[in-house]
Amino acid sequence: MDAKTNDGKAGQCPFTSGRGHKNRDWWPEQLDVQVLHQKSNLSNPMGRDFDYASAFASLDLNAVIADLKALMTDSQDWWPADFGHYGGLMVRMAWHSAGTYRITDGRGGAGGGQQRFAPLNSWPDNVLLDRARRLLWPIKQKYGRKISWADLYVLAGNAALESMGFKPLGFAGGRVDEWEPQELFWGPEGAWLGDERYSGERELAEPLAAVQMGLIYVNPEGPNGQPDPLAAAKDIRETFLRMAMNDEETVALIAGGHTFGKTHGAGDASLVGPVPDSAPIEDQGLGWKGRFGTGKGADAIGSGLEVTWTQTPTKWDNNFFDTLFGFEWELTKSPAGAHQWRAKDAPAITPDPFDESKKHVPTMLTTDLSLRFDPIYGEISKRFHENPDQFADAFARAWFKLTHRDMGPRDRYLGPLVPKEVMIWQDPIPAVDHELVDDNDIADLKAKILASGCTVAQLVSTAWASASTFRGSDKRGGANGARIRLAPQKDWEVNQPIQLKAVLAKLEEIQAEFNDAQTGGKKVSLADLIVLGGSAAVEKAARDAGIDLKVPFTPGRMDASLDQTDVESFAPLEPRADGFRNYISDRHQFMAPEEALVDRAQLLNLTGPEMTVLVGGLRVLGANAADSRHGVFTTRPGKLTNDFFVNLLTMDTEWQPVAGQDGVYESRDRKTGTLKWTGTRVDLIFGSHSQLRAFAEVYACADSGEKFANDFAAAWAKVMNADRFDLKA
């Protein structure tokens, strides 16, 4: 077959994909359900049974680190090392791998090794990092499946720091590689460096945590390229806050990272080739091929900035602050035309990366000067300048947090280099220190819970509120810890605080009575009782519908204390909308309700069918927030029936918007006009969207009652156990 494609015809037939349009091209506003089916085993070459934790346990980590350190000074002709050392490049690669993390939805971060895929591999802010990854390939090739790319990126950053005289706090493995690009909302813009994400007085849209499309944090030249250090400080503070860093951590990270290496802007930026995913096939995935001089070494062009921050760019010291405070600064431009700063009336004291006989005047970025001239950052910077030990400690802690923030609890950390210290941002939960309840205890506790006076709806709502905070993105939230009884979760509107307090009081009575009656050290945690109560209610609802159902339950959750809870960091877990509970808050919504439902389902690691069956079941069980009747398409609430789907899909009724109630609809009998039900966009999407309707039709069939109940129980248990990493080990 002639595989030529340059005539636009040959090579297309008989392939049906060709260059034709996809469904999303024809209907771009259609709800995207495919995000629920990412990370499929079908794209994983390691196979379903591959156990990365076991493979990592067999790794000689010290040997890998030794190889990484040897790499740092083994300069390659195809991409020569600045100052004879790849340390600065590797620190930047690790930083940018982890630095996509955003606290609003927990997405981004180093886990999964997404930097090797589009769009991250082609972001302007990741220019030339493809070289760092290619330099690592021989080491990855040597150790194979024993270390993931995701772990290797972070470990390379740590090894680089060590090789330049800095001692990191530690390293945890456990980041499992992903095998396809994530489809994430990185911003509304259709062009690199666009900034349509702002409104009002430079208010950055959520959940975004970078100022422009294709940047990790901020524009190093200043807001939209305007070289204003004070304005840049505002951007820095907002973006670093959105990736869970306070002011001290921010200063430590910027100053610590900029202690090493340099930026690249040797010539005209127009002489840089296409990004990796647009590069010609013969370039084999390497992008940004330079046509200025040799295109490498002294002729390299990356960001367009040409800055070396210190006089010792391959050594950990305090020279960044020495330079920052030691000179006055004047605006200039790099050879590529980018705004940067040079020291006024300063001698040429900064080394050249490739010619030892040359020296240069000290240079800084606009965002570096922010650390001096912003009043808050300036005070911290002066303290770090005067107290190098404080700076080193702050950088070590901030670097560890940066590179491990998306890994979740310490239970997931692997390897001998894990720090012993427990940090509050890890959302610690006490280890199990008592005998767990057995099957007989569980049966007795279920009976007591159901006899407590709490309704099915109340028990289901409480368990769902506790467990559904889980985010598969950064592995935070979930039922373990019973943090639903603590601030801020106990006060969230969606959790119905008055009802929640009453239900928790009943469960705490049962817990105290059970624990006080034990003589052998056996106990039950409130976290376990909350989940058990919800599961007992689901089983009762199934029995009342004529179906014998057993919801899987495994004890072992523990109760966290308020001292173990960073209240402020849990605030972003509060849902603006929760379609599973038909809830929309008064806060600004940056997604349509049905999009928010899919988004939350994706964070819960649910599939399309699981999302569908859970919505249908939760509606008939009465789990709506504020006891709303929207979507409760049944005359027998509290029973686990498929009525939601049957009554949604019938053609005996028709739907119309309710005047004056945006997003609310009513269903009336086609013949009599009698009002039957009311529902929201989240409810109606299961009849409107073709794929979701296909799922709904499965559960609406006359023979689907038992399948519906069993599928609901399985999906319910999946959510209840979403944070039980001890069960998945």
UniProtKB/Swiss-Prot annotation:
Crosslink position(s): Tryptophyl-tyrosyl-methioninium (Tyr-Met) (with W-95): Y217-M243
Region annotation (Disordered) ranges: 1-24
Location of cross-link Tryptophyl-tyrosyl-methioninium (Trp-Tyr) (with M-243): W95-Y217
Signal peptide: none
Catalytic residues of the enzyme: H96
Root EC class: oxidoreductase
Source superkingdom: Bacteria
Known EC number: 1.11.1.21
Entry's cofactor comment: Binds 1 heme b (iron(II)-protoporphyrin IX) group per dimer.
Record keyword Magnesium present: no
UniProt keyword list: Heme, Hydrogen peroxide, Iron, Metal-binding, Oxidoreductase, Peroxidase
Catalytic activity: H2O2 + AH2 = A + 2 H2O; 2 H2O2 = O2 + 2 H2O
Record: residues binding heme b: H258
PTM field: Formation of the three residue Trp-Tyr-Met cross-link is important for the catalase, but not the peroxidase activity of the enzyme.
SUPFAM superfamilies: Heme-dependent peroxidases
Gene Ontology terms: cellular component: cytosol
Cofactor: heme b
Protein's GO biological process: cellular response to hydrogen peroxide; hydrogen peroxide catabolic process
UniProt site (Transition state stabilizer): R92
PANTHER family: CATALASE-PEROXIDASE, HYDROPEROXIDASE I, BIFUNCTIONAL CATALASE-PEROXIDASE
Function: Bifunctional enzyme with both catalase and broad-spectrum peroxidase activity.
Record-stated family: Belongs to the peroxidase family. Peroxidase/catalase subfamily.
HAMAP family, alphabetized: Catal_peroxid (MF_01961)
Subunit structure: Homodimer or homotetramer.
NCBIfam families linked to this entry: cat_per_HPI (TIGR00198), PRK15061.1 (NF011635)
Protein name: Catalase-peroxidase
Organism: Nitrobacter winogradskyi (strain ATCC 25391 / DSM 10237 / CIP 104748 / NCIMB 11846 / Nb-255)
